[in-house]
Design a protein with these regions (language model features):
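NAD(P)-dependent short-chain dehydrogenase/reductase
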Residues: 116-119, 129, 141-202
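N-terminal Rossmann-like NAD(P)+-binding domain of SDR-like oxidoreductases, especially those catalyzing
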Residues: 1-162
Length: 202
């Protein structure tokens, strides 16, 4: 958006352990970009809406690591469900007088659970198999309920695995590369027979 369109972009980020400021170096000094360190669970989020008057929201905020969700489910429940709820409430209140705003909620294919044959699509039944997937499924249902109940314009996308430059080393592709370079064992999930689609993000 910053490089190709004449938009002013506000990046709201909690800046957790997996954040990487290097990813914004190309445009961090741009007059069309503003970074706000902020937790979307904070009820003052609505103030940012009314101050900057956005036309669109891309909700990529989430705890996303499956293994960590097994060790600490509570963080995923708070950030992915409560965070989405607070975002939706802020969006709903702002949308009352600003009808042009739209929401794109980024979800995951993990909400469909194990796909034993073929592939999953957005019409499949949700069968989350980890606390992470369950928290994202819950946030999806919240978004859909606000779309139906309050008529907010929202789209839910269920993208597959992603990888790219500066990704946190706990993610699979960076972890595999690191382990290969350091002669460490490679992680195998299940029987190692699963296949996944990957999206390259630069």
């Amino acid at each position: 958006l910053l490089l190709q369109k004449n938009f002013f972009v506000i990046n709201i980020d909690k800046a957790t352990y997996s954040s990487n400021y290097y990813n914004t170096k190309e445009f961090k000094d741009s007059k069309k970009y503003k970074f706000i360190k902020f937790d979307i669970k904070n009820k003052n989020l609505k103030n940012i809406f009314f101050k900057y008057k956005p036309h669109g929201i891309f909700n990529l905020a989430a705890e996303t690591h499956v293994d960590r969700s097994i060790d600490s489910p509570k963080n995923f429940i708070k950030n992915n469900i409560v965070g989405t709820f607070n975002l939706l409430e802020s969006f709903r209140n702002y949308h009352i007088k600003n009808k042009n705003i739209k929401l794109i909620h980024i979800s995951t294919d993990e909400v469909f659970g194990d796909v034993l044959i073929g592939r999953s699509d957005e019409n499949d039944t949700y069968k989350p198999s980890s606390p992470y997937a369950a928290s994202k499924a819950s946030s999806d249902h919240l978004v859909y309920s606000y779309y139906r109940t309050f008529n907010i314009p929202a789209i839910i996308t269920n993208c597959s695995n992603n990888y790219g430059p500066n990704q946190h080393p706990e993610k699979l592709i960076p972890k595999l590369i690191y382990n290969i370079l350091h002669n460490l064992p490679l992680p195998i999930y299940g029987k190692g027979s699963n296949s996944r689609e990957w999206i390259y993000v630069k």
